[in-house]
């Protein structure tokens, strides 16, 4: 079993809370954690990110996919495009529709996710948001959670979890991931 981390817009594999989560998962859960580092995240192109996934993810049943922000819709695209099953999913500040705050990302949501194809592939899924996120307002993430029939965790604060505090940790992500993997 391997966990793959999908970062978001203007981000990289070594930003925010991603390195902390990778270290924590590998140390405490003894599961390989691969942080994907998508090209040109300041000007993302869906087809380029799709190709990156093709060359960096081993599409095996039972993998776990973790996404943040734009990485969440990329997780769904990946699931839609591959014949894999029993996939665990953790999405943090995800969306599956155009967002007024980030119109530059509309190309990733121009074609709707085929949930009739995606849902049967998912074993467990949790979606996390914060009530005060200005980048991806939580109603977008709640809609995504409803489409996925997911457990939804709404934090009272945290904005977009891009700083995750001075220590760059996001304990709720680890706790929810641990529960998903039980």
What role is predicted for each listed range?
Residues 32, 146-162:
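Catalytic histidine neighborhood in serine/cysteine hydrolases
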Residues 42-50, 94-118, 165:
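Flexible "cap/lid" loop of the alpha/beta hydrolase fold
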Residues 66-76:
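Gly/Ala-rich beta-loop-alpha elbow adjacent to hydrolase catalytic centers
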Residues 84-97:
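A conserved short beta-strand
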Residues 134-140:
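Conserved alpha/beta-hydrolase "acid-adjacent" motif
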